[in-house]
Amino acid sequence: MSSSYYVNALFPKYTAGTSVFQNASGFTEATSCAFATNSQRSSYGAGASAFPAPMAGLYNVNSAIYHGPTMYNTGYNLNSDSYNLRCSALDQNIPVLCSDLSKQGCEKLDQTNVHPQAESNFRIYPWMRNAGPDRKRGRQTYTRYQTLELEKEFHFNRYLTRRRRIEIAHALCLTERQIKIWFQNRRMKWKKETKAGSSSTTSEEKQE
């Protein structure tokens, strides 16, 4: 029993060459692919349009979307210009919006001009400034009074406690870090002096 028997039994009302849609205004006859003849199937080639003639203008890639003739133009008396009214208004507003972004209001304000009075009243000390990675730290210079007081303290105490270091820093108008570094350098100098003195005494004893 051939397969055509089942096809005819299941679909008795469909015959070869019959169209799926009835003839209507604005549409062409489109035959079913399953029941089309060989001559009709060969017409669906690469060059054939995928859509009917009235819809080709709407989906044509090469032409504008709204300029092609459609089946709605005749029914509602719409021209191609009516579709471009809203789009033209948006196109005109786009450069206006983009030009607003380049105004001075979008630029970052200079922080130096925000609070000029507050910065003039605020006193910045040299040790409060942020030192960059390429900037060399200058050598700390001490006055004669500061050096004298530090030498006195070092004569009695080689190492300082934190509490004593804070007291000296407030008394001499220095920071704790400066006091700590001075005592570290002074201890290194003292060790070199004692080491040199001990070596000289041993050499003198050997000569005797």
UniProtKB/Swiss-Prot annotation:
Q: Locate the motif Antp-type hexapeptide.
A: 124-129
Primary localization class, coarse: nucleus
Tell me a GO biological process for this protein. anterior/posterior pattern specification
GO molecular function per UniProt: DNA-binding transcription factor activity, RNA polymerase II-specific; RNA polymerase II cis-regulatory region sequence-specific DNA binding
Function comment: Sequence-specific transcription factor which is part of a developmental regulatory system that provides cells with specific positional identities on the anterior-posterior axis.
Q: Which InterPro entries match?
A: Antp_homeobox, HD, HD_metazoa, Homeobox_antennapedia, Homeobox_Antennapedia_CS, Homeobox_CS, Homeodomain-like_sf
Keyword annotations of the record? Developmental protein, DNA-binding, Homeobox, Nucleus, Transcription, Transcription regulation
Source species, domain of life = Eukaryota
Of which family is this protein a member? Belongs to the Antp homeobox family.
Question: Mind telling me what this protein is named?
Answer: Homeobox protein Hox-A7
Q: May I have one GO cellular component term?
A: nucleus
Question: Mind telling me which SUPFAM superfamilies this protein's record contains?
Answer: Homeodomain-like (SSF46689)
Q: Which Pfam families did the record assign?
A: Homeodomain
Tell where it localizes: Nucleus
**DNA-binding region location:** 135-194
- The secretion signal range is none
